């Protein structure tokens, strides 16, 4: 038995190496026939021993059909990227980076290096996260999902022959990449497909979202990896170093990666990538520009959605011509009435487009858009269809688009404010009220569990809910009269509404629906002004002092709290028992408060993210590099060069046990 297992291990190692040479390097060292003979030998041994190694190539395609997708919590967050659509926006991003670095270097002895960027292609596929354990075995693969929780697609990813099932690595890592379908694979699949695929992106996404693993394998997907999102081993000092690590692990990587020291070089690389876009065997929709130095990334930090040290440059979208059939006017949460174009259905980038953005009447007149005319439609950022103009020859039999004078839902007279039309009937205009209630109850706002748009519509139509405050007046007996509301569901909603009364101030500010104010801005306002009363009475001059609040956002906030009706609604909410609170985090005295700490090596009781959170909760600053300003270096198993640097500089070194004793 032992001899057979050893032979199996030997065959698995050989076959995986041959697959890497064939699929990744495109340089096979043995013939297909020799490979097949070894593969067949492995299959026979697996049947005889009834043992299959988790990284065996026979695991790439299974006969099973999965029942459902399970959730997977990523060890490291998968961030989205901010986007630039032109060089002006890219230069603005670059200048913001320069400003932060100059400020940091003026106050710190440990200077940051001059900005250096790495430019890569932006692949148009599906983002995936692959987890390899301390033995180098692929144990989990997942979709991006929310960035924190994705769906387990391990079986599907194993069908991608370029993705190694085992790597030569001795610590847990998560590697981010893009699963794609090549044009060659797309054409081959469609030759025999009963339902041909429309585009490469759908081909890749559909394959990974398929519970029939054999069907996934038929799509013959590929992948490129470009980021280590979680790493329990030695930390990287630069993105270049990270990319070399990914390559050395045998993970497939695009050959194009360029280093730039200024925006002129970045622009040239973007132009080059766009020039070869049509020649590639896969789709790209832009370029990605990232800061190379890892410490600089840490100083630049993150917004609530994006890393500030990376940005995606989006290429011009595709355009096509179709007929404008009609215009539909819709009412938003703020009462703004906006036009949507109804189009003769047309295929654009593999998607059937039936509707498009028109923005407002000024936009319609400027573009000379008319009913019945042929219009140019663009999928901006390859996602949102927008009308860019008209075909002049088609205007002869077209009709003018008339601006509405009444609300399409409640028939109230509309008022014009600048380029927009508004319905001021906030009490009985269904779309306004329903969207306001849904926003107020959402998870990031008042977090009223079990609330939905369908529920909001019923509350408006059947219970005559005409304001946010009316939510807190609802009785259980009233809910029981609604469709699908039984005793338990009614009681649960009443409880959820009552529980929401005790909410943090930032969530309450966000729930109010102030124009241009998202959750991050709400948090920043609370951090600056501390109380609801202070926020209500602040000036525009004070508001622009808040990080990332410019004059437009400041005026939105100021005007919002100048509205007597809004102030009256807020007072009613407070009188009904809503108690928004703000608590400054208090940190007890401890040996690590206000200390700079560097962590190196693997800890027994903490992941890298957990120890960072723990240290920050103690009031410590966590740094990625050791300097004479470092107070402690916390050392785990297999420490890297930071340990040697600490000894060299005479920095205090502690192990995990000493750390635990100090915080008891």
Curated annotation (Swiss-Prot):
GO terms for biological process: DNA repair; DNA replication. GO terms for cellular component: cytosol. Zn(2+) binds at residues 407, 410, 423, 429. NAD(+) binds at residues 32-36, 80-81, 144, 178, 314. The keyword Protein biosynthesis does not apply. InterPro entries: BRCT_dom, BRCT_dom_sf, DisA/LigA_HHH, DNA_ligase, DNA_ligase_CS, DNAligase_adenylation, DNAligase_N, Hlx-hairpin-Hlx_DNA-bd_motif. It comes from the Bacteria. CDD domains: BRCT_DNA_ligase_like (cd17748), H3TH_FEN1-XPG-like (cd09897), LIGANc (cd00114). Its cofactor is Mg(2+); Mn(2+). It is an enzyme of class 6 (ligase). Its EC number is 6.5.1.2. It catalyses: NAD(+) + (deoxyribonucleotide)n-3'-hydroxyl + 5'-phospho-(deoxyribonucleotide)m = (deoxyribonucleotide)n+m + AMP + beta-nicotinamide D-nucleotide. One of its GO terms (molecular function) is DNA ligase (NAD+) activity. Residues 587-664 form the BRCT domain. Keywords: DNA damage, DNA repair, DNA replication, Ligase, Magnesium, Manganese, Metal-binding, NAD, Zinc. The active site is at 122 (n6-amp-lysine intermediate). DNA ligase that catalyzes the formation of phosphodiester linkages between 5'-phosphoryl and 3'-hydroxyl groups in double-stranded DNA using NAD as a coenzyme and as the energy source for the reaction. It is essential for DNA replication and repair of damaged DNA. HAMAP family: DNA_ligase_A. NCBIfam families: dnlj, PRK07956.1. Belongs to the NAD-dependent DNA ligase family. LigA subfamily. This is DNA ligase. It comes from Clostridium botulinum (strain Okra / Type B1). The lineage of its organism: Bacteria, Bacillati, Bacillota, Clostridia, Eubacteriales.
């Amino acid at each position: 038995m032992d001899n057979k297992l050893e032979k199996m291990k030997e065959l698995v190692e050989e076959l995986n190496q041959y697959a890497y040479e064939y699929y990744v390097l495109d340089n096979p060292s043995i013939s297909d026939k020799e490979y097949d003979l070894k593969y067949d030998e492995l299959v026979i041994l697996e049947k005889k021993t009834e043992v299959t190694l988790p990284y065996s190539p026979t695991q790439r395609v299974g006969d099973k059909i999965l029942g459902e997708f399970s959730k997977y919590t990523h060890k490291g967050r998968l961030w989205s990227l901010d986007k630039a659509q032109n060089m002006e926006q890219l230069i603005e991003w670059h200048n913001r980076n320069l400003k932060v670095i100059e400020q940091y270097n003026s106050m710190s002895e440990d200077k940051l290096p001059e900005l250096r960027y790495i430019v890569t292609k932006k692949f148009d596929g599906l983002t995936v996260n692959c987890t390899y354990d301390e033995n180098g075995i692929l144990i989990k693969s997942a979709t991006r999902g929310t960035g924190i929780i994705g769906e387990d697609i391990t079986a599907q990813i194993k069908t991608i022959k370029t993705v190694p099932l085992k790597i030569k690595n001795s610590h847990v890592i998560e590697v981010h990449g893009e699963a794609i379908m090549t044009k060659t694979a797309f054409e081959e699949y469609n030759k025999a497909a009963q339902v041909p695929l429309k585009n490469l992106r759908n081909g890749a996404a559909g394959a990974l979202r398929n519970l029939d693993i054999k069907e996934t394998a038929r799509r013959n997907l590929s992948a490129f990896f470009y980021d280590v999102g979680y790493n329990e081993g030695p930390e990287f000092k630069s993105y270049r170093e990270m990319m070399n690590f990914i390559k050395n692990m045998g993970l497939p990587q695009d050959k194009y990666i360029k280093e730039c020291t200024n925006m002129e070089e970045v622009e040239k690389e973007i132009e080059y990538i766009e020039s070869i876009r049509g020649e590639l065997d896969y789709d790209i929709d832009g370029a990605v520009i990232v800061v190379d130095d890892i410490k600089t990334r840490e100083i630049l930090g993150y917004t609530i959605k994006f890393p500030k040290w990376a940005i995606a440059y989006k290429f011009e979208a595709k355009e096509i011509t179709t007929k404008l059939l009609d215009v539909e006017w819709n009412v938003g949460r703020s009462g703004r009435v906006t036009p949507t174009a109804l189009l003769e259905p047309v295929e654009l980038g593999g998607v059937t487009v039936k509707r498009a953005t028109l923005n407002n009447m000024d936009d319609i007149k400027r573009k000379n858009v008319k009913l019945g005319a042929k219009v140019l439609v663009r999928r901006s950022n390859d996602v949102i269809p927008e009308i860019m103009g008209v075909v002049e020859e088609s205007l002869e039999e077209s009709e003018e688009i008339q601006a509405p004078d009444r609300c399409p839902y409640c028939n109230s007279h509309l008022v014009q404010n600048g380029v927009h039309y508004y319905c001021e009937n906030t009490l009985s205009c269904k779309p306004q009220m329903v969207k306001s209630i849904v926003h107020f109850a959402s998870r990031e706002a008042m977090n009223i569990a079990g609330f939905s748009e369908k529920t909001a519509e019923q509350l408006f139509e059947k219970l005559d809910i005409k304001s946010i405050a009316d939510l807190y007046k609802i009785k259980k007996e009233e809910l029981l009269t609604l469709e699908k509301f039984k005793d338990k569901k009614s009681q649960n909603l009443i409880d959820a509404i009552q529980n929401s009364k005790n909410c943090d101030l930032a969530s309450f500010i966000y729930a109010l629906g102030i124009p241009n104010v998202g959750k991050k801005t709400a948090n920043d306002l609370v951090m600056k002004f501390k109380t609801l009363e202070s926020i209500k009475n602040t000036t525009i001059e004070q508001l622009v002092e808040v990080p990332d609040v410019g004059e437009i956002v400041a005026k939105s906030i100021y005007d919002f709290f100048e509205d007597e009706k809004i102030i009256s609604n807020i007072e009613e909410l407070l009188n009904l028992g809503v108690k928004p609170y703000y608590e400054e985090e208090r940190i007890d005295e401890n040996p690590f408060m206000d200390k700079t700490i560097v962590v190196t090596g693997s800890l027994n009781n903490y992941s890298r993210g957990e120890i960072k959170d723990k240290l920050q909760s103690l009031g410590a600053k966590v740094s990625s590099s050791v300097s004479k300003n470092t107070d402690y270096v916390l050392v785990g198993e297999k420490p890297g060069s930071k340990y040697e640097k600490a000894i060299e500089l005479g920095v205090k070194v502690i192990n995990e046990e000493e750390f635990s004793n100090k915080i008891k």
